[in-house]
């Protein structure tokens, strides 16, 4: 084989190996995603906690606006 063909073959093998390693590194995260999707209950609790935090934030913003409205303008 000529050196040009060997270099081309080397790069092709390198690209395929890189793609395979990327695919194999995705497998654990895919399994973790499937497990969390099957459980499901934890996600609902997380969303409920986020909604509660958002409501608290809205309440604090309203209190801050009310406080700023009471301050005198200079």
Curated annotation (Swiss-Prot):
Q: Where in the cell is it found?
A: Secreted
Function in brief: Shows anti-inflammatory activities, since it decreases release of pro-inflammatory cytokines, and increases release of anti-inflammatory cytokines. Acts by blocking the Toll-like receptor 4 (TLR4). Also increases MHC-II expression in LPS-stimulated cells. Does not show antibacterial activity on Mycobacterium abscessus subsp. massiliense. Does not show antifungal activity. Has low hemolytic activity on human erythrocyte and low monocyte cytotoxicity. In vivo, does not induce immune cell migration.
The entry's family comment says:
Belongs to the non-disulfide-bridged peptide (NDBP) superfamily. Short antimicrobial peptide (group 4) family.
- Propeptide positions, renumbered to this chain? 40-74
Write down the superkingdom of origin: Eukaryota
Q: Does the keyword Cytoplasm apply?
A: no
Per UniProt, the keywords (alphabetical) are: Amidation, Immunity, Secreted, Signal
Biological process according to GO: immune system process
What tissues express this gene product? Expressed by the venom gland.
Cellular compartments per GO CC? extracellular region
- Residues that bear Lysine amide: 39
**Keyword Secreted appears in the UniProt entry:** yes
Please identify the protein, giving its name as recorded: Peptide ToAP4
Q: Which residues form the signal peptide?
A: 1-22
Give the main localization category.
secreted
Something else known: The primary structure of the mature peptide is identical to that of Antimicrobial peptide 6 from Tityus costatus (AC Q5G8B3) and TtAP-3 from Tityus trinitatis (AC P0DRB7).
Q: List the disulfide bonds.
A: none
């Amino acid at each position: 084989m000529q050196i040009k063909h060997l270099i081309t073959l080397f790069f092709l093998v390198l690209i395929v190996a890189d793609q395979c390693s990327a695919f194999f590194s995705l497998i654990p995260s895919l399994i973790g995603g499937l497990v969390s999707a099957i459980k499901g209950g934890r996600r609902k609790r997380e969303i409920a906690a986020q909604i509660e935090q958002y409501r608290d934030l809205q309440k604090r913003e309203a209190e801050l606006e009310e406080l700023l409205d009471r301050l005198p303008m200079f």
